Regions:
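Hydrophobic alpha-helical segments characteristic of transmembrane helices
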Residues: 110-112, 116
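Cyclic nucleotide-binding regulatory domains
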Residues: 44-48, 52
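A short, polar/charged loop-to-alpha-helix boundary motif
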Residues: 53-65, 118-132
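Generic alpha-helix initiation/capping and coil-helix boundary signal
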Residues: 16-17, 49, 120-123
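Bateman/CBS regulatory modules and CBS-like beta-alpha motifs in cytosolic regions of diverse proteins
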Residues: 1-26, 32, 37-38, 43-44, ...
Length: 145
């Protein structure tokens, strides 16, 4: 099964120049802890509620701070034609719960996949594999803790 068959296609994004206040409002409205940061059609980063609450606040940054100043620029992603099990393993290895999905053709953002999406798919055992890896101590934890 391809990841495109279980990913969420309608994804809210923020731009690097938007203030973190707007990113936080989007997250609150969408009940999401992570948002892709896009410049035009290109994914340039991810911003998490943790980036806003911990990094920005700890550094004394205000609500008008541009997202680019606190986002993670080293983004792990998958392609829409990747197999669900392969993506679950990638999520497990990196210890992330969500991953942006790009088009292989032009590398534009086409969706986001979460453990919940995978668990509701026909490949629900892949979610168990990912969850086991995510809950193990260690790993990269670069996008969502």
């Amino acid at each position: 099964m391809k990841i495109a068959e279980c990913m969420t296609q309608e994804v809210e994004i923020v731009t690097p120049d938007q203030p973190i206040r707007e990113a936080a409002r989007f997250m609150l409205r969408a009940d999401a802890g992570i948002m892709p940061v896009s410049e035009g059609d290109r994914l340039v980063g991810m911003v998490t509620d943790r980036d806003i609450a911990v990094r920005a606040v700890a550094e004394g940054r205000g609500p008008d701070t541009p997202v680019r100043e606190i986002m993670s620029g080293d983004v792990l992603y998958c392609f829409e034609d990747d197999e669900v099990e392969a993506v679950a393993l990638k999520m497990s290895d990196a210890q992330v719960r969500r991953m942006p999905v790009l088009s292989r053709q032009d590398e534009t953002l086409v969706g986001i996949v979460s453990l919940g999406d995978i668990s509701r798919s026909e490949q629900s055992e892949a979610a168990s594999i990912a969850l086991d890896g995510i809950t193990d101590p260690g790993g990269e934890r670069s996008q969502s803790e």
